[in-house]
Amino acid sequence: MSNSNKLIAEKNGSRYGRMIHPWLRKKQDMLADTPSRREGMTYEEELSKRQQGGVFIFDIAMQLTHGKGEHGLSGVAATLFNRFFNVHSLKRCDFRDVAAACVFLAGKNEDAPKKLKYVVTQLWQFKYPHNKQFQSEQHFLDQCNVVTLIEDVLLKTISFDINVDLPHQYVLKLMRDVEKGRNVYKDMVKTAYYMATDVLIITDWSVRYSCASIATACVNIAAFFHNINMDDIVPFELSDRWYRLEDQSMTREEVEAMTKEFLDIFSRNPQFHIGSLKKIDPLGKVKIVGMPPQVSSTVTPSGSSSNLKKIDLESYKGRPKPLSNSSDSPSTRPSFLPDVKNQKVVEQELMEQRMKEAAQQKIHRNGHRPSSSSHPLHHHSTSSSASNNSNHQNRSSSGLSAHQHQKPYNEDSRSAKRSMMYEETNSSKKPRIDYKMSFVASSSTTIATMHNDHFSQTTHQQNISTYARGVNEMMLNQVAPPPLMSVSAQPSTYQKMCMEYQRNPADSRHTMSSTQQISPPDEPSPPVSQILLPPPPPPPILPPRLDEMEEGELV
């Protein structure tokens, strides 16, 4: 057996040793004197803040562990959280930042460290649910600095006493001694194990009771929810001392007091529990008196059972209205469905519909009829204006015929429209300057008139302001700017050389040598007479070698 296993066996299965400092306090002391109490906060307000911090810790742990190992991480972090606020007041700092620092330190303590950026990201998302993204990188760095600073303060506050023991292992050991291998209370064991995490989060028992005492209370609470009496399921020899198996100082009265306190918190604060109330209390033995949990569904069932029955069409049309405060007697609700069984009613409705259609057609026909007396300024003297007027009449007549026959426009009518609209495609296009717009002021309306020459519109000069007339005259009398003076560029050296070569064509009769070199255009070139160089000398004649000479040949 290794040394670590020997140490665990000597500590009766406990992973950690005893706490260095006496963190456990009695409830009377916490009611009388705590840092938050000195700041004017009551015990109920302090307990509510501790519960909010515990739920905040569990939410962050669930996101970081993805549902694997959240009980150990959240239990250690909640214990560190309660120890911290036994020394500091809840009014001095934000409990959410302290909760994130406790999670960060608990990950290191449980040999499962979490990265700081993940902890800070989850802290920001739960702290600001409506703005889950950091505004800038500086906000992220500032929040990281806050968490690390609180972690240092937390370590100094608890004097590096990070030996946090959890009640979960004591729950399993106690149920193993009670069942004696029967394995018939699996659901009760699961509930007790879940309660070991729940009580650390929604109560301050981690700084009031030992882990063995908390485990005993969790087993008794689970037995209460499952309607089981512990004295009936324990062996006969353990019937009077089963609650002292893990903690010799526990009494039956203390176990009952802890159970009653948890049930009171359970009934007054159901929103702080980390699980479903139906799973915790399947039999509904505890009456909820506090704020009920939020229901996701917004549909409320109707109180009348008649609405859930299937009825025929006649009953649906003539069903009575529900009773209201204004009227004492029920009245028949008017139906929006036509009575198809009565032939007279159907014929009457058809006649009314036809009369409405005829009235609409008459109004439409009167609205599109051209009147020459009402608008004398709309007459045009050119063929283009006449063609436009005829096109408008054709469109209105075609629209009337289509409305009378209740038929949509076909492709022939559309093609006819296109031909009339684009019949002057070969005409010359007017320049854009000729299209000048102006308005003629009538008695109450402004009528736009388009002339046949350049489609201009006339207006009264008195309607134009003085500033507008001045701007118009300035634009008309504006003198065109003088043309830019042409600057003669001096010829480059290369251009001068080419010009000189063109003036002296006799130099081109000389044959150019292979070694002739012409300077680049940017550099000053020598005269053309110096460009032609003499040919290179002939190669030297070497005497033949001795080994290549034949016999009898003279050197």
Curated annotation (Swiss-Prot):
Q: Which protein family is it in?
A: Belongs to the cyclin family. Cyclin C subfamily.
Q: Which UniProt keywords apply?
A: Cyclin, Transcription, Transcription regulation
- Per the UniProt entry, the signal peptide is none
Which GO BP terms sit in this record? embryo development ending in birth or egg hatching; positive regulation of DNA-templated transcription, elongation; positive regulation of transcription by RNA polymerase II
Query: What name has this protein been given in UniProt?
Result: Cyclin-T1.2
What exactly does this protein do? Answer: Regulatory subunit of the cyclin-dependent kinase pair (CDK9/cyclin T) complex, also called positive transcription elongation factor B (P-TEFb), which is proposed to facilitate the transition from abortive to production elongation by phosphorylating the CTD (carboxy-terminal domain) of the large subunit of RNA polymerase II (RNAP II).
Per the record's keyword annotation, is Glycosyltransferase included, yes or no?
no
Basic and acidic residues composition bias: which ranges? 341-359
Q: InterPro entries from the entry?
A: Cyclin-like_dom, Cyclin-like_sf, Cyclin/Ssn8, Cyclin_N
UniProt biased composition (Pro residues): 521-543
Q: Where is this region: Disordered?
A: 315-429, 505-555
Q: Name the encoding gene, please.
A: cit-1.2
GO cellular component entries: cyclin/CDK positive transcription elongation factor complex; nucleus
Record-linked Pfam families = Cyclin_N, CycT2-like_C
**Compositional bias annotation for Low complexity:** 321-335, 382-398
